[in-house]
Regions:
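Conserved nucleotide-binding/hydrolysis micro-motifs of P-loop NTPases
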Residues: 21, 57-59, 131-134, 156-157, ...
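N-terminal cysteine/histidine-rich coordination modules
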Residues: 1-74
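Short active-site oxyanion
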Residues: 48-49, 104-105, 122-125, 144-148, ...
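Short basic, glycine-rich beta-strand/loop surfaces that mediate nucleic-acid
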Residues: 145-189
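Extended interfacial segments that mediate partner engagement and assembly in macromolecular machines
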Residues: 57-131
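Positively charged, polar, low-complexity stretches
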Residues: 111, 138, 142-151
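Short helix-coil boundary/hinge micro-motifs
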Residues: 13-16, 122, 138-144
Length: 194
């Protein structure tokens, strides 16, 4: 999916690794008026953007080595909980996108409903709870041949989408919402991998 969106203008350089990636795989930060590093998940805040690969260890390194301050040539404060703040913001964004899919009728939730959609050829993005039972996840993944699968959010987080206590399986129909959700889940995965 990412190759469809990549153009020369969409690439940024990570301030930690120096690696050049598409901004869909990165996180933007700006320095606020109080000289603090502020995550810009929506990429809309004013100011010079400082880009990092969407990975926990890269943000840790940027904070530890004061790379935000070095890039803007002044003292920049980074909160101790910046990594957790970014993870929470990305998780919230993913849940919001799933709720938008639900409101627009593009979300199918529940194991039997998702299985039925997959067997009928409805494709999109399969979202599975990261803490779901391995046997059940394997069964549903086997039906999803050729369908992108993300397993980043917990069942409790997925449950928030429908007001349930838990949700393990969800399918977002092909479209812009599925593409945006895939991007955000990919960025969140960089903060949740072991």
């Amino acid at each position: 999916h990412l190759a469809e969106f990549c153009d020369a203008a969409g690439f940024r350089t990570c301030i930690v690794s120096g690696e050049r990636k598409h901004k869909f795989e990165m996180l933007r930060f700006v320095v606020g008026p109080d000289d603090r590093a502020v995550p810009d998940i929506e990429e809309k805040l004013p100011g010079r953007g400082l880009w990092l690969g969407a990975e926990r260890q890269l943000l840790d390194a940027a904070c530890k080595n004061n790379l935000f301050g070095k890039r803007v040539r002044r003292e920049v404060e980074t909160k101790n909980d910046l990594v957790f703040l970014v993870e929470a913001l990305l998780s919230k964004k993913c849940i919001e996108l799933l709720q938008m899919a639900r409101c627009s009728g593009a979300l199918t939730a529940g194991a039997s409903e998702v299985r039925e959609c997959l067997s009928c050829g409805v494709v999109g993005l399969l979202v599975l709870a990261s803490d779901g039972a391995p046997t059940g996840l394997r069964k549903i993944t086997a039906l999803a041949e050729g369908v992108p699968v993300r397993s980043v959010l917990t069942s409790d987080e997925l449950g928030l989408v429908l007001g349930r206590q838990r949700l393990v399986n969800a399918l977002v129909e092909t479209g812009r919402l599925a593409e945006r959700l895939d991007r955000e889940l990919g960025r969140l995965a960089g903060f949740r991998k072991d």
